[in-house]
Amino acid sequence: MTHRHDSIRMNNHHISATALGRMLRGVLCAVALGLPCSLYAQQATYYASATGEKGAALKTALSRIVRDHTVRTYANLWDDFRETDCRPDGKVWDMYSCITDFTFGDDQAGNFRAEGDKYNREHSFPKSWWGGSSGEAAYTDLFHLYPTDGYVNGMRGNLPFGEVKSVTKQSAQGFSKVGPCSVSGYSGTVFEPADEYKGDFARTYFYMATAYESSFAAWAESEGGIMLAGNAWPGFKAWALDMLLQWAEDDPVSEKERDRNEAVYGIQHNRNPYIDYPGLEQYVWGECQDVAFDAADYKDPATIVGISVPVAAPSDADVPVYDLQGRRIARRHLHGIRIENGKKVAH
């Protein structure tokens, strides 16, 4: 099984940018003009009360829909992970390490000395950002809790997500990294996840900003103030928001995320709208803030704002290409993971 996004490399297969542009515009125009689509019909009732809202008001409307959920105990999470984070081969799906093959139950918690020893419960949105109180619903919210390698989890600590300009620590094969931030607007130490999970974590953070909208201002007074703006909207500081939006665009919603969304819904009885509606973050924070959301007739932002194809791309360029859902499927090469003989292999 491969968890990576399809890519089209233009090397040695020359297609003129002009011809490619015409082809893609034709496809996207057909989509925008009303090809039959039932992709969002099943979620329409759940999100119906947010229909017609835009920007900040849309985020608040979504918050009212998703914030109430069945709160789990911390002990429940071990069993919950079996439903939410199980690889096709039955092993734990670890998003921090590419070398682990953890068995549910047998390898949970306990002492660890190195990467690959044990997995634990990771608050991808650090619990110290709200004071660590177990009384907060976020403490056990599965939409931001993941089973991860204990050693790499400790390497991250409560560092914010970011992109590193130089590596001070890293997991095996450089899958996850720690170092000074290269993103304009922040230069402190950050934790950079692997490319193929950046979109997953971006949508996790969009969910947190939405479900816990009323708490975000207070959370910014703690260590969370590195990424959080101290308000309900936009909720994130400019550097963090720009980065997360880019991550979501570069790493679109995957089958893994959709399956996990359904599994969490079966347990907590709420959903992540940014998975249900790919590109929804553009309606809240991005280029589609002036477009009214329609839960039953959702328009992917790519079909609204169009596409950009370089006029004279060099022969070795990665040209932006979108699929029929408006998801970018070619931009840069990403790390890949596959299951081979029962082992998770990075390539």
Regions inferred by a protein language model and the residue ranges of each:
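Bacterial N-terminal signal peptides
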Residues: 25-38
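Residue-level detector of functionally pivotal "anchor" positions at catalytic/ligand-binding pockets or at interdomain
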Residues: 295-328
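Domain-level detector of nuclease and nuclease-like folds
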Residues: 111-303
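N-terminal module-boundary/linker segments of secreted carbohydrate-active enzymes
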Residues: 41-101, 290
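Bacterial N-terminal signal peptides that target proteins for export
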Residues: 4, 8-28
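C-terminal tail/sorting-segment detector
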Residues: 337-347
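Short cysteine-rich loop/turn motifs with clustered Cys
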Residues: 93-114, 118, 149
